[in-house]
Design a protein with these regions (language model features):
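Periplasmic peptidoglycan-binding/tethering modules of Gram-negative envelope proteins
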Residues: 6
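Extended, low-complexity, intrinsically disordered C-terminal regulatory tails
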Residues: 42-72
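Second-shell loop/turn segments in exported
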Residues: 29-37, 88
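Catalytic cores and adjacent binding grooves of peptidoglycan-active enzymes
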Residues: 76, 80-81, 85-133
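Stable alpha-helical elements in mature extracytoplasmic
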Residues: 37-44, 94, 98
């Protein structure tokens, strides 16, 4: 199934996310903006958390255009659409396990940095890619 077929809408404020609070995905400049995260991304992250079997810290979720610019994000950042997350990860063992979990649940775009992993499902971008920062 292609990612475009699985692509869902923005999360409903009444829907429950099992392992996360919507506030964990807030852009730091707008309280409550984590509600802009795509529901499929949240469901996939719950699956990742289940498989990873350890707490996951979201470093960046939804971003407002202002915050995205402030952190040096690209103009077409998937964070602006609620389709991306950056997960804190600073050791090789967890990094390996977390990447495997992300791939297992269907994240098809992964960026690897020294202290975080970026994962997104943006259907407007090339799929099946992994890069380093």
């Amino acid at each position: 199934m292609c990612i475009r077929d699985r692509f869902g809408g923005v999360g409903d404020k009444k829907e429950k996310v099992k392992y996360f609070n919507y506030s964990e995905f807030d852009s730091p400049d707008v309280q409550g903006s984590g509600q802009m995260m795509n529901k499929l991304v949240l469901d996939m992250l719950d699956e990742v958390r289940e498989k990873f079997d350890k707490p996951i810290h979201i470093n960046s979720g939804y971003r407002t255009p202002q915050h995205n610019e402030a952190v040096g994000g690209t103009e077409n950042s998937s964070h602006l659409k609620g389709l991306a997350v950056d997960i804190t990860c600073d050791n090789s063992i967890d990094r390996f396990d977390l990447i495997n979990c992300l791939l297992d649940v269907g994240f098809s775009r992964i960026g690897v940095a020294k202290t975080f992993i970026h994962a997104d499902i943006d259907p407007d971008k090339v799929q099946g890619v992994m890069w380093t920062y």
